[in-house]
Design a protein with these regions (language model features):
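Catalytic-site neighborhood detector that most strongly recognizes the C-terminal catalytic loop/helix
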Residues: 27-33, 45, 66, 118-155
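DNA-binding alpha-helical recognition surfaces that contact promoter or target DNA
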Residues: 12, 77, 103, 116
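Active-site/catalytic core of tyrosine-dependent DNA strand-transfer enzymes
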Residues: 39-89, 95, 100, 108, ...
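Short, polar N-cap/turn motifs at the start of nucleic acid-interacting alpha helices
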Residues: 16-24, 88-90, 109-130, 152-161
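Short pre-functional
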Residues: 1-8, 102-106
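Conserved tyrosine-mediated DNA breakage-rejoining catalytic core shared by Y-recombinases
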Residues: 3-50, 121-125
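Hydrophobic, well-ordered secondary-structure elements that form the walls
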Residues: 40, 101-104, 114, 130, ...
């Protein structure tokens, strides 16, 4: 939710994909087949840095085979169990991306940059054939707006808890 990425892409996070110094996740395999790199906002980077990868470099290893990442099926099953127990609301993993897209827009991140952060295929001729810019600077600016928005929401929630 903090990065707007597909749950299964985050689940496959490996030390080889994470550049802690630059706070960038760089994937070579993605759903649309295109390489994809995103700047990670500070709130998410802090969480990633708090996770100790296993001996094979996976941040989220499979419980059955630690040489592999957790499967998307395991993640979906976990979500369903949590919903059935009333721990989380009835949402799907896709809802997380949809919510990110909506709230990032509310935070002031332009739609084109949200699309690029989420690695949505751009179908216009210019994007497909001519534009080779990686948009990292623009994605980083968008993620900075998003991080500021998230931190403000979390601070507001904390203040409400203190009052209650």
């Amino acid at each position: 939710m903090l990065t707007g990425q597909r749950v299964e892409e985050i689940a496959r996070l490996h030390v080889d994909n994470w550049d802690a110094e630059e706070s960038i996740i760089d994937w070579s395999k993605t759903k649309n087949g295109a390489p994809h790199a995103i700047p990670v906002p500070p709130t998410a980077a802090e969480l990633i840095e708090s996770i100790k990868p296993n001996e094979y470099g996976w941040f989220f290893p499979s419980a059955k085979d630690p040489k592999r990442p957790v499967s998307h099926g395991t993640l979906y099953s976990f979500m369903w169990r949590q919903r059935d127990r009333g721990v989380i609301p009835v949402v799907t993993n896709r809802d997380l991306r949809r919510t990110w897209k909506t709230l990032a827009g509310q935070a002031g991140v332009p739609k084109e940059i949200r699309d690029r952060i989420q690695n949505h295929a751009l179908h216009d001729v210019s994007s497909k054939s001519y534009d080779r810019w990686n948009y990292m600077r623009e994605k980083r600016a968008g993620m900075a707006k998003w991080d500021k928005f998230v931190r403000a929401m979390l601070a507001k929630k904390r203040r409400l808890k203190l009052v209650a």
